[in-house]
Amino acid sequence: MNHAQTEGINLIFLERSGELRTEADLAQLPQHLSDPRSLIWCDITGIEGGQQGPYGQLLRKVFGFDELTIEDCFTTNHLPKVDIYDDYLFVVFFSFHLSEKRQRVETVEVDMYVGKNYVVCIHSRGLRELDRVRRRLLSHDEFVSASPANVAHTVFDAVVDEYLPIMNRLSAIVDGIEDELLAAGDASDAILDSLFHLKHELSALGRLAVPSRDIVGILMRPTVRLIPEDSQMYYDDVRDHLVRVIDMIDTMRDYLSGSLDIYTTQQTQRINRSMQRLTAIATIFLPLTFITGIYGMNFSYIPESNWRYGFFAVLALSTFLAVGMIVYLWRKKMI
């Protein structure tokens, strides 16, 4: 095995002898590519320079990859996908990372080529998942070193293994939002903003996880010759992990939608109770307004205006009507 650390490019050559040659460099790539019994790991960090930069030229001139796949490597905003060529596979998938400070999931696109004797990964920044793959290769891991299909599986497995802890952390955040939302009664704008943001985030993660599951399913088909049958059982384990991740995403989205529905129902009930009280108050004062309205008209002659006890009689009548309305509304359970 030969290992070289070139600026932005990590190379590992597994040779027939199994030796580790530290002096290996990019100049040795064509020689190893022409040897079907070699195994090459090429990990490229950074997409600076674009398609015409040094990394793009490496993919084009040394590996001979299709121009459309090279374009995909140096542009963003893709969905996971797999393109099957005669002598290699091109796979796009995503690494998830949770920002504890911002409580948001950041995604990093990983583009991977899988050939008969090589695996090439391209990503915009360093990923600890791929560092673990590199360490396993350098430790002469028997499974990983067996074939490019096993290396590709190890990459998938390392990336997907990071999904579950993130889903568990998001689940705890969802539970916290749900508890705050239902306990607070009147939710603050911050809680509602967190809820809507998390729903949007889960939808985005679902749009990445579902096609990733489908990709693994495609790679397990017998027609994909670069993934031998003895490696497919390991890919099935990755697919099971992705199915679990998708189920967790759907469950969390349902919890958030249910919490929002309950909160909306509570708010509606609260408004209805307020309207009921206002209606009761208006009903109580309606006869009083009627009476005072009549006696407030500017006429020279108003009944009982010259009666000594007229004011007290009207006051007593108003009180009687008000008490009567209160008793009536109370019996009707409106107040």
Predicted regions and their residues:
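Peripheral, non-transmembrane regulatory/ligand-interaction domains of membrane transport proteins
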Residues: 1-251, 304, 334-335
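Hydrophobic alpha-helical transmembrane segments and their immediately adjacent juxtamembrane loops
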Residues: 240-335
